[in-house]
């Protein structure tokens, strides 16, 4: 991906959150990984390539305690990973509007971020972990529901092949 740059942000405990971004125009896409997934898995690679073809920005990161970010995995909780997502969005919020693509646990985090950041105007949730939210899932406001596209089990709008990314 051209124009890719790496970033480091200090988490609330001073440990570094590491990620990568590519600039683009009109829209930015933030990919939030699922539980125990590193930022450059197959989904994020395919999505990054597709964003580049659209001329959109793309960003992905590793939560503290996993991947290339600092810290021990066992020292962090969901609250910490929500804070990591806030830090990344704070870094990027002054650019074009955001679509957050969340995978599994990342969908749960994305849902919270969409409520906190006005720059997030679209969500794509892959196998969202809403069962973790209990009663909160029932309290999703209509305006947030209008942002959400739920995709169960697979990302059907982007198919990664060895030669290209195609829309289906």
Describe each PLM feature range:
Residues 1-24:
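N-terminal cap/lid segment of alpha/beta-hydrolase-fold proteins
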Residues 26-34:
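Short beta-strand element of the alpha/beta-hydrolase
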Residues 100-102, 126:
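Short beta-strand immediately N-terminal to the catalytic nucleophile in serine-hydrolase-like folds
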């Amino acid at each position: 991906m051209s124009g890719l740059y790496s970033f480091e942000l200090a988490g609330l405990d001073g440990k570094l959150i590491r990620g990568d971004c590519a600039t683009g125009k009109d829209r930015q896409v933030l990919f939030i990984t699922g539980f125990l997934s590193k930022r450059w898995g197959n989904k994020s690679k395919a999505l990054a390539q597709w964003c580049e073809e659209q001329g959109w920005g793309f960003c992905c990161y590793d939560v503290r305690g996993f991947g290339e970010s600092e810290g021990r995995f066992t020292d962090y909780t969901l609250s910490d990973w929500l804070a990591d997502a806030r830090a990344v969005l704070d870094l990027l919020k002054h650019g074009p509007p955001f679509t957050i693509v969340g995978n599994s646990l990342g969908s749960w985090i994305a849902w919270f971020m969409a409520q906190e950041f006005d720059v997030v105007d679209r969500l794509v949730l892959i196998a969202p972990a809403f069962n973790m939210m209990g009663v909160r899932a029932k309290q999703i406001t209509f305006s947030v529901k209008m942002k959400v596209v739920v995709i169960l089990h697979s990302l059907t709008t982007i198919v990664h092949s060895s030669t290209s990314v195609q829309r289906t």
